[in-house]
Amino acid sequence: MKHLLFCIIALLLPTVTTAENRTYKLEVKSLQVVVNQDWLSPAVMRLKGDDVLNIGFDELSHDYHRYVYRLERCEADWTTSEELFESDWLEGFNHNVIDNYEHSINTTVPYTHYKLQIPNDRCRLKLSGNYRLHISEDGSDEDIATVEFMVTEQSMTLSVNVSSNTDIDTNQSHQQVSFGVKYGNHIMTDPQDQIQTVVMQNAREDTWRRNVRPSYISQNGLEWQHKKELIFDGGNEYRKFEILDPSHPTLGIEHVSWDGKNYQAQPYISEPRMNYLYDEDANGAFYIRNSDNRENDIISDYVWVNYRLKAPQFIEGHIVIDGHWATEHPDTYLMNYDASQDLYTASILQKLGYYSYQYLWMKEDGSTHPLPSEGNFYETENRYQILVYFKGTGERTWRLTAYSQTIIN
């Protein structure tokens, strides 16, 4: 029965987990995807510029694995770009070895850190749009990880506004997005067929609002005003903790102990938050580092983080832990109810660093909602991302022509 439950969760959770990045091997941990050094933002890079996509991950051993990567060009809906030749979007080679790796040093959990960059001297992207990068062992067809990122050409102009004065309520529990796009030099014959849009909150897949019909169509652009489909729950600020040294508890950590094999970190019990209190957070982002902030990739150790949430037991659905670092098998982030303590608990192996996270209530249909005990407030500082895709007359693919990120505060 437990195996069946995990299978059901695995089917539902991909629509819940924030990151489009996935790991499929138990020993692969701490998948990081960052453009330049901006760890707070989604992986969106400019087509013509100096942006660099940095990808890194750990394999929990000192054994060498010959990992390779290949790129896949995708359409606006993340299906493969079947009508394009590889040479249309890629300059160079599309089956490359990850030859940059280092073993961990003096860690209780041994691991090997692998990393790569896009573009590099072997491959460079020629076209804007969506991309999926597959990582596997050389000679194997099975991915050990996949990474999704976007390349924007910024050839259209976006204007965005987020307000707590919504078409549902005013200054209560919701936030509403309004935005407009200017075509620029693009020739537009049928805007509703040639434009696709995505709006999301904190880069969470389960908040994506795709192709909402515009309110106004003009010769120069489109506008989305007073659209109920663009109203979002305010939610609450993400919770956070930071573990920089397993021998000393730091931000959000009650204590750290050694069980003879691993370090065990106990964040403070997550108590109900019925009133809003501003607390600067990272909206699900994470940053690997240690107390010396040096050689973070190979000196930072792993600890078991034991989450505890004070909440009544839910009869329907499940409670999951959510953050951009949550890339492993879905049941890793499923919380179990401990009736003896009246707590939901979960234990996750994580690398030293700063982590931003939230608890979500996942219903049986896979939809996610703020926990009643976490609160739902219009003041919450959320980040909204807007993407605009364009497909010109006679063109074979959707290009990402505009991207913007706006913070409500």
Residue ranges and their predicted role:
Residues 89-114, 205-212, 304-352, 362-392:
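Aromatic-rich carbohydrate-binding modules that target alpha-glucans
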Residues 265-315, 400-409:
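Basic K/R-rich, polyanion-interacting modules in nucleoproteins and related proteins
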Residues 113-121, 218-231, 343-350:
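Exposed aromatic-hydrophobic patches
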Residues 108-138:
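Ligand-binding face of N-terminal immunoglobulin V-set domains in extracellular IgSF glycoproteins
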Residues 1-21:
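Bacterial Sec-dependent N-terminal signal peptides
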Residues 76-78, 122-123, 137-144, 204, ...:
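Short acidic/polar inter-strand loop motif in beta-rich domains
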Residues 23, 151-174, 377-402:
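Low-complexity, Pro/Ser/Thr- and charge-rich linker/hinge segments at domain boundaries
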Residues 26-75, 170-181, 292-307:
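Contiguous beta-strand segments within globular domains
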